Amino acid sequence: MRQVILLITNRSDISVLDKIHSQMSLSNESNDFFVLYNGTADSLPKTYANIKERFFCFSNDILYTMGYFPLGDSLAPGNCHFPVLKFYLTHPDYDYYCILEDDVTFSGKWDTLFSYYKNDVTVLLSSHIRTYSDYPEWPWWVTLESKEEDFEEKDVICAFNPIYRLSNRALKCIHESLSNGWRGHAEVVLSTILRHNGLTLKDIGGNGRFVPKGEENL
């Protein structure tokens, strides 16, 4: 099993640098690491000069060059899956892609968390996974659209994604669906596409319906 950790950022402060070095220290034959950096390679801050080989740089142009349908003209809110898909398309040989936002903190050891799910074949690991009926007041449901598919309300799923993991199979499915006209906020379109295609989702915390028995409130 080969996994890559992807940290999404446009920052260069000490907090982010510490996170980068922390993840780099875990890199080995099974676990790789890259920074998805919102900026050009030429504009990388000097802070990153010695580790620039770990950077996958992108601009907001990816919103219009990948054949998908974005929400607005910026990554946030709702388009943060674009650089993840871009990385997948240029690095398609990993089994799993674990994505971290740059403000995520974890009080435990990252390698313990990653090792716990090492043999888990679920295509999406995320948190606070809910159906429309669980959380009808969530404002981003209305962004979900598909030109070719119908979906029932019970199959519309949102997931909170400051940290989440997608399998290679999941990303292939998502890429094909987005290319065929699906669109929406990242936290609803990714999970709904996977659910619509009969793939598995797992909530990695709490006690909701997508948390497996015995793994509540881990």
Kindly give the residue locations of the regions a language model identified:
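Active-site-proximal specificity loops/subdomain of glycosyltransferases
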Residues: G39-D93
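N-proximal low-complexity "stem/linker" segments adjacent to membrane-targeting elements
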Residues: M1-S15
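Short loop->beta transition adjacent to catalytic acidic/histidine clusters or analogous donor-positioning motifs
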Residues: R2-Q3, L26-F34
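Short, well-formed alpha-helical segments that are part of the catalytic scaffolds
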Residues: D13-L26
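C-terminal catalytic/acceptor-binding lobe
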Residues: S177-L218
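Conserved catalytic core of nucleotide-sugar-dependent glycosyltransferases
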Residues: F106-T192
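Short beta-strand/turn micro-motifs composed of small residues
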Residues: L7-T9, V35-G39
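Short beta-strand-to-loop acidic/aromatic patch adjacent to the donor-nucleotide binding site
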Residues: Y94-D103
